[in-house]
Amino acid sequence: PAAPEPQAVENSVKLADNATFGKILTDSNGATLYFFSRDTQDTSVCLGGCLDVWPIFYAEDLSLDAGLDEMDFATIDRTDGSKQTTYKGWPLYYYASDAVAGDTNGDAFNNVWYVAKPDYSLMYARAQLIGHDGKNYLEDYSEGEGLTSYITDDHGNTLYIFINDTKDMNSYTNPDFSNNSVWPIAEIDLASIPSILEVGDFGSIEVYGRTQITYKGWPLYYFGQDSSRGDNKGVSFPAAGVWPIANVNTTLAP
């Protein structure tokens, strides 16, 4: 008798073409995977009842479609004792209300859940602002406890604006970049962005031969003393509100 046809083994993480979002990450069955804006540290804060709606994705034996880099994936030990696969530091989840492969019903849910894509240039985080001074800050830079949404790079590193800058004008960086280690310019090529953000709000400027990304006319920077993913210490340095985060509420640069 003829030998049975070998079954094609599907990779544990696949790259799917989605009509709305372009390239997205799915599991081996084509179920869409998601990022959670609140997972700014190397852990998951989706616990308890949250997991009923957003079940975790974990691949014990990771196999990837072409175009995905194994170095971008890792496994975390969750506080509930289970394991979860991460991509560029973001834990991966399913959305329980996605019924069939290709569904993306969870995107922009409460403005904190986004379809996982390999080509995001930026991400949208939501976390407590904790300044360089160790104090908790709210979005208006008064002291207090509460979550603020803000733009990060694809790995979750916080981006800032400088209140002394004007539209498409970096007033901070020295021509020889001697102070660039304090507030490094964000040199990011814009590809895909989370659906809450508008492509038209982004641009770029030339800064002494290098290219800096802008948002609503504001040049974007990193803070050199943010040493870990999820840090947002720049909000209080040298004083609260001099280097704010950027989010959809940010006003246009003057």
Predicted segments, located by residue:
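Compact beta-sheet-dominated domain cores in extracellular/mature segments
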Residues: A2-P254
